[in-house]
Amino acid sequence: MTGSRFASGGLIDRKKPITFQYDGMRVQGFAGDTIASALMASGHQIVGRSFKYHRPRGINSAGPEESGALFTVGDNANRTPNVKGTIAEIHDGLIVRSQNAFPNVRYDVGAVNGLIAPFLTAGFYYKTFVGPFSGTRFWMMFEYFIRKAAGLGVASRDADPATYDIAHHHCDILVVGAGPSGLWTAVQLAEAGQSVMLVEQDFACGGQLLSRNNARDAAFIAEMQSRLTRAGGRIMVRTTAFGLYDGLVTGLVERVTDHLSAPHESLPREIFHIVRPQQIVLASGALERGLAFGNNDRPGVMLAHAVARYAGRFGVSAGQSCIMATSHDGTYDDALQLAEAGMQICVLDARPCHTDAQEAAKRVGLDILFETVPVQVAGGRGVAGLEVGMCDSDGVVHSDNRMIGADVVGMSGGYSPVVNLLSHRGVKPVWDADIQAFRTGPTTEAIQVVGSADGFYDNEACLASADVAVSHILRPRRRDAETDI
């Protein structure tokens, strides 16, 4: 995989170039880039190493679910380890370092661990260096080196020079997530006279709409934000809802200055917000699931929607030729978007040809292999090709050693609604066979779940679920108003 920047497109501001350091090298991006998108556009393929065997790691996702692109950001007392490059914004003067590698991620001597993997089984150090010797001297001799090898980034030992703040809020409605369903819900409730707080962990509102980068979606996002602001609602970006407690008390963390080159000295780095709403709407979206196949951790193997998101939002091509392995219709929109952007696309669909999305993709000339699944990625430091096999009606894979050339593999096993916040309240997820995922279970508290967080992945269905939630929230208030009259 060799990433590059498309000549046009994306939501970045190409009139505002930004230069930052990555492992001592100068890298250029643009305003609106994340660390991950800027590195991908600059052709950086290996950005990390695995914890134990130091296998090469690339960028896997485009959001907070990222597990491979973890960096140490800042210097000296301002050094922060294990920062997810997929959500961290770049700014002039930013210092970024790779982690868990020596001398660097491209040539890491720790990769020798892979050669002796049979001897490094889970918990090997407890068996190898403990007993049958008397006492613990043998273990104590090796413990230092084992502990030193553990972990990824290294935290600073200097005192943190930044300041932090805490704030308390009361509101009628707290909406978590500013995708299409979250925006639509917040606008309707605010225009109905409710005091609304809308929080979004990203630095821009829009959710999945940001990936498509078309005029209609951009107009919808702008209109929703404008209407919400005019109605008195509050929008908080770069803000993560991390905890849901008794009485609907919600904990938020707002990142205030990490994206600024020279923040004013009076600004705190982060603010811990404690919100006490009357009702909560969870529009936290869904996360794409990967697929299990050989070497699916190689640089260049990504979540399918992430490949499209880098193209649509950041104007970055993850490679020249992409294989999209999927088991559902949603991936076809991503494949068509990438094909229109100029990438060579081949879709592997584990299912037979039965759906409208499949037929539509065939009509526009997309290369599709039905009842075909990935078996193993070829290539040591990236994707050189993909071995594929046939999947029969019983789900058994039959490999025929067929190899397809590509430098990017996008994989998608469907989506899983983000149910963690409601789980904090003891609500158990419920399996839904129709969407092959866990959905939020029923709750007696004043909490509504909308959009992809409730298992609706079509944009119209997401907005319809928001309408239902708004009606449910406003119904008691309308009844009270009629009683007062």
Predicted segments with their positions:
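Residues forming the flavin
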Residues: 1-25, 29-485
